[in-house]
């Protein structure tokens, strides 16, 4: 089974915020594939389907961003999954706005959701699809307000285009594209 974890925060106040781009990407993929989410006992909302003969599970952790690893670990344990079959969709302030980047391994880069996943899985070698938010000034209160802020109307066309590209990128991964192939096709 392929597991696609979109990272974000649960609650209407976080809907359409920059930090929730992972949720937005997994929602876009679900919509494109006529999938709907339901609650699970593994601290998440899940949607399941089969694409090209491959079982696929979309996951939105309900633990809040900074404890996403709890849901990842619970899902992998319950479904006897492995980090090799995981794709994490996550925001990245160090990427220019509107760019996407696949990364097969590495540190959390200061992202608490990724840090939680690494802590709970004991691994840094899971595939991530990072969505560029751009970076405001490096003052902590400005950064927090930026990531928890909603996308502007001017940003919406770029976000929609990025979500469309991510839907195709996720489909390519499900169909067996390797990390280097995905990087060559989608990293911008």
UniProtKB/Swiss-Prot annotation:
Broad class of enzyme this protein falls into: hydrolase
Residues with site note (Discriminates between blocked and unblocked aminoacyl-tRNA): 9
UniProt keywords, alphabetically: Cytoplasm, Hydrolase, RNA-binding, tRNA-binding
Compartments reported by the entry: Cytoplasm
GO MF entries: peptidyl-tRNA hydrolase activity; tRNA binding
Catalytic site: 19 (proton acceptor)
GO BP annotations listed: protein quality control for misfolded or incompletely synthesized proteins; rescue of stalled ribosome
Site (Stabilizes the basic form of H active site to accept a proton): 91
Binding, tRNA: 14, 64, 66, 112
Family matches, as InterPro entries: Pept_tRNA_hydro (IPR001328), Pept_tRNA_hydro_CS (IPR018171), Pept_tRNA_hydro_sf (IPR036416)
Its EC number(s): 3.1.1.29
Substrates-to-products reaction catalysed: an N-acyl-L-alpha-aminoacyl-tRNA + H2O = an N-acyl-L-amino acid + a tRNA + H(+)
Annotated GO CC locations: cytoplasm
Family designation: Belongs to the PTH family.
PANTHER family tied to this protein: PEPTIDYL-TRNA HYDROLASE
Quaternary data: Monomer.
Functional summary from the UniProt entry: Hydrolyzes ribosome-free peptidyl-tRNAs (with 1 or more amino acids incorporated), which drop off the ribosome during protein synthesis, or as a result of ribosome stalling.
The protein's name in its UniProt record: Peptidyl-tRNA hydrolase
Native source species: Leuconostoc mesenteroides subsp. mesenteroides (strain ATCC 8293 / DSM 20343 / BCRC 11652 / CCM 1803 / JCM 6124 / NCDO 523 / NBRC 100496 / NCIMB 8023 / NCTC 12954 / NRRL B-1118 / 37Y)
